[in-house]
């Protein structure tokens, strides 16, 4: 069968499959068919809930199977090309980084157990206030003939003040020379954003290495992270990129970082592990990822010059990098055997801005990703449809309940959300062997109250660019993220007041259900609050080097 015909059939097939999945979920939602229900529908279980429950069950099953496969992958690495050892370059993107985090990052890079690993750190900024990062580079990795640096007035796409065309070309050659000649190199360049920084590292390396590992400057790497990701790429030539397990370095600094830590574990070890089973991980995270350099150099220019609705894209760099690999028909994988720790926002507003930026890139890349559904397993199509449209179904459900339901319906909805969260959290406790994962059930409320409006705001402002979150040396508070959250809270409170005003007096049965549900919900929150305070009290006074992961060195 001709290749063009096969491709056309796959495109038609995956498109029809996506429509069937979306149509099925929509039909189940609209019809509201219920399998069982009590008198007056105080309690019920319907088709829509069954579909979501089945999705979680299947996702958890394949995640478990992928983890079992990972545990069997501990045999010695056999390189396909015995004549020449594989070469790897670690590219670190740095922007106004907290000095302590940067030191930890560079020290961890120095301890990576891989021979002749090349480390390239590119600093986004060449002003006087940025030189402290070069000083830290000299402190940790400098002082030997293997280290080199260059302070560049320009970058590859924008000339600095006083630069001529000749001096710009000379600067480009100097950057390449420093990177090629040095085991450890640091390039300071004119500010241009994270994508510009990553481009400089990739462009300067050219075809000098086999694989490129990416890392953020707030990341602490496990010494075995490189060899474990390399193992995945070497064992299957059809795998173009692989990501590792990203955990939180500052998880006990605040409640938001603590909840983020359990959410991170769930996202990587359940959601991405499931995607990895089918070879279609949709985002290789910036703190820990590795790509075949031969592929990366193919799409480097297209990746850098990406546009959306006529505007140049300056966020979602890692997700688009992953999508470019998928667009070539190569598989993307995840391995929990490769680990790192990374910083996460400890303040609500900074976390909200980060989530809004990630949501922007998610929806934009969802559209791009849909062009390549036909090149991969049907799971990629199915999961993209479910996760892409789920927030909109949830928003419609919440608004309908708060404006057309009863007080009991609202309380039951909250209880159901927490019940689903508890089920997922219990499975995570079993999979990880850590009771702290029970707090994953609280993240569902954070999702409902903050992430839903942030996603809508992200769609409305999808063409707004920038780093999204400020550098960590100087934290800049951006209150714009509070606007959609405030509107959402006002909508919900208005619906609650309207429902309470319109509802008739409670019957004895309704009152009993309402009081019982409220007491149960309150006890649940009190129990988790006490557990959280106990965990924090136990951690109080412990130093960072006592964290469970040995590579989290100060």
UniProtKB/Swiss-Prot annotation:
Annotated compartments: Cell membrane; Golgi apparatus membrane; Golgi apparatus, trans-Golgi network membrane; Cytoplasmic vesicle
Protein name in UniProt: Hyaluronan synthase 3
Pfam families xrefs: Glyco_tranf_2_3
Main location as per UniProt: membrane
Stated family: Belongs to the NodC/HAS family.
Membrane side Cytoplasmic: residue ranges: 1-15, 66-378, 431-441, 496-516
Glycan attachment sites: 463
Gene Ontology molecular function, alphabetical: hyaluronan synthase activity; identical protein binding
Organism: Mus musculus
Top-level EC class as recorded in UniProt: transferase
Gene assigned in the entry: Has3
CC cofactor: Mg(2+)
